[in-house]
Amino acid sequence: MRIGLGYDVHKLVENRPLIIGGVTIPHDKGLLGHSDADVLVHAIMDALLGAAALGDIGKHFPDSDKNFKNISSLLLLSKVKDLINKEGYKIVNIDCTIIAQKPKMLYHINAMKKNICKCLKLDNNMLNIKATTEEGLGFTGKEEGISANAICLLD
């Protein structure tokens, strides 16, 4: 059994779509990044790679590589799944938290779960996604960015 912890953060900017968990969420700002900047999926990828002792997403998908420009993070997550499976690991469960003042994530969590479970070929009960705010504190509370944490168990 191996445990992995992942974290990601991206700045909110104008003229970008807000994609979290593979879901495009209506909002006046989106996340800045080389790929689609999906903080939730990035945190999950780092947790999985960490548990398998395979480094991090920057090692496998560097932002200096033009092939990853605006790429769907779900596509990268599928590649991470293949990497950990190649090492003989399977996912037992994943637990995640999205930290955002706005927009409210509650209405989008089921769609996020569906996307990620489909990508990783997980049963619905193997993935938990929740969201919280920081009560107006810090960069997420001031709506300057959105972050996500993920923890996973591999067998």
From Swiss-Prot:
- Residues where a divalent metal cation binds: D8, H10, H42
Enzyme Commission identifier(s): 4.6.1.12
The cofactor(s) it depends on are: a divalent metal cation
Pathway it acts in? Answer: Isoprenoid biosynthesis; isopentenyl diphosphate biosynthesis via DXP pathway; isopentenyl diphosphate from 1-deoxy-D-xylulose 5-phosphate: step 4/6
**Any note on cofactor binding?**
Binds 1 divalent metal cation per subunit.
List the transmembrane segments: none
> Alphabetically, which GO biological process terms does the record hold?
isopentenyl diphosphate biosynthetic process, methylerythritol 4-phosphate pathway; terpenoid biosynthetic process
Q: Which family does it belong to?
A: Belongs to the IspF family.
The protein's name: 2-C-methyl-D-erythritol 2,4-cyclodiphosphate synthase
Originating organism: Clostridium botulinum (strain Okra / Type B1)
* Name of the gene this protein is made from: ispF
